[in-house]
């Protein structure tokens, strides 16, 4: 059995970690970075993930997808999705099942399918480090994710070829990373997690007793559509509005210009965490009849803070609610942990410190803590990490719709999971032979105001006056926060149950098709990589051979020289194509044709006093391999 890796599947960046001995280790990706941009780009030839995708975003805005986590498990008609449609350069479309999907080059792609590309990159990163196949993972989600969003994340893992052993809440994972090995007997911490697209706040109690650590989540809350992307959008709007005032041109109508503004806005926001002002300079951003237009704008930290202060204030309101739910006062919080890149903003740190009356901890890496905690949980599940008990909670209340369109709650929010709860209901009409169980998630009294998770029928109820049949409804939530619901007629013993999969979710058949597509793409990607390697080798051989012709070609016969140059030319032509076998055949042809060149080079070296020549790659594979390896390492 291999390792269980921990993956922080973030809105803006993702991170992967694994237990290395008794410590969790963050793994660097192929580009040498510890985090990977959660960006996916579809080009004519391949699918790019991470930094390569980000680099080409400006020239390919409609097919470069980012912040997909904000769409996962969401309905197309939802307010959040409709807001995103107005600002995203790519096309968000309505799927047949009512979900928000993305249209790329005429193909409709589901958010779990797109997110799976990032998970595959994380999986490959871990496999390259461990030197073995990875099939199991713990994946983190925002604590405030509802059931549909959790299911969609598990689906993304399946499509990526991962068995998702556990879904763990991001603040809980950060607490695990912070508290692992702590010797303090009892402490209550607040985890304030403001990431790229989501916000969570959790109050967690860490107990140490007789060598065992217990991490108990007392309460959690948040907003699954508040994060760094929203901060970026405020800056984007400001830049575009200022340019429109000056030039009377709306850059929102130009996808490429909008992508340039987005990159500049994110860069300006980051710079203003350490500087008091920054310049946004985008030459040739657009043009009109009078000629090209340049965008130049100074943004101060004070201006940025004015643009986003209401976003920060809304997060502080959530803090008050969660503290109340946890039954704790501000003075009872021992430590504050800041997680997520947006917490680097001085205004965020200031407002959190003002609320708690103390500074947050500075020794927790906001970009890596969640992945580290996920790896720790993987170690717990594997049995490699012992004496840790994790008690998480369900973030939202669960219940069913009852007479009058009311939501009757069976499981209150912030109930420790896994949990099981039953309640007996009855019929609303005389001789009713069936009941519909409509499962809801949320805090509103009116059923229609809550999230519908699905519904099912219990049929075959014996005719009886209203109120007489006894229908026992049971909610069972597993450790992933995924819900099973059953209804049983206590008189007849008939039972019906479902594992909640919202009507907006992917069917098993769709998931399996996406898994097959992913496997097919993986094979295509492998073949593409092999062709690139062959091209690199061909380029190295052609370069080295031409160099040696220049150095020793004067002692070659005209026929030999012409033959070698023709072979090199054919190799260079083959290297422009997609046929790996042809490229390799042309490499062999150059090596064979270059034998007289090698002999001439040796003869010339002996005449020069025995000095060893620079050997042709045609005879010395070491030279070629070194050149090829160097190219590979620099990727």
Swiss-Prot record:
Modified residues (Phosphothreonine): 198
Start-end of Low complexity biased regions: 599-617
UniProt GO molecular function: ATP binding; ATP-dependent protein folding chaperone; unfolded protein binding
Regulation: induction: By stress conditions e.g. heat shock.
Entry keyword set: ATP-binding, Chaperone, Nucleotide-binding, Phosphoprotein, Stress response
Function summary: Acts as a chaperone.
Record protein name field: Chaperone protein DnaK
The organism of origin for this protein: Haemophilus influenzae (strain PittGG)
